[in-house]
């Protein structure tokens, strides 16, 4: 958090600690030019994340996918994306720039799904 706070001070980035799963959505109706999510999956947040991306904003999302149970944790299907799930999340609202559903070898073997998508139009 210290490194992030230092970056925020110089780059105009706002940092926030929030419980995204058990508390109210902490960002209200705000929208952002970009949202990056890594190694995290709580499906009920998908609509909130999508709605929080401004017109022509970008979503970059990468997390573990089905098949990862072969390599270790996470292995619970609740924490693994289903095939094509990120494509479904952005369908009809975003233009997909890049998408992968694959096995990686570094930093350790894992199945991941990743997407970079741009919101079409001027707003949510």
Which stretches of residues belong to each language-model region?
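A short acidic, Gly/Pro-enriched loop at the edge of an enzyme's catalytic core
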Residues: 21, 25-34
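Core SAM-dependent methyltransferase catalytic element
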Residues: 101-124
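Class I SAM-dependent methyltransferase SAM/SAH-binding core
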Residues: 1-23
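Acceptor-substrate binding/catalytic loop of class I
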Residues: 69-85, 106-108
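Residues lining the SAM
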Residues: 33-38, 62
């Amino acid at each position: 958090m210290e490194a992030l706070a230092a970056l925020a001070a110089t780059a105009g980035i706002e940092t926030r600690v929030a419980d995204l799963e058990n508390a109210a959505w902490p960002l209200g109706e705000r929208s952002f030019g970009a949202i990056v999510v890594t190694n995290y999956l709580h499906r009920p947040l998908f609509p909130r994340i999508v709605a929080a991306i401004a017109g022509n904003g970008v979503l970059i999302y990468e997390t573990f996918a089905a098949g990862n149970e072969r390599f270790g944790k996470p292995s619970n299907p609740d924490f693994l994306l289903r095939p094509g799930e990120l494509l479904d999340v952005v369908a009809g609202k975003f233009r997909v720039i890049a998408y992968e559903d694959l096995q990686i070898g570094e930093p350790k073997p894992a199945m991941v799904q990743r997407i970079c998508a741009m919101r079409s139009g001027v707003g949510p």
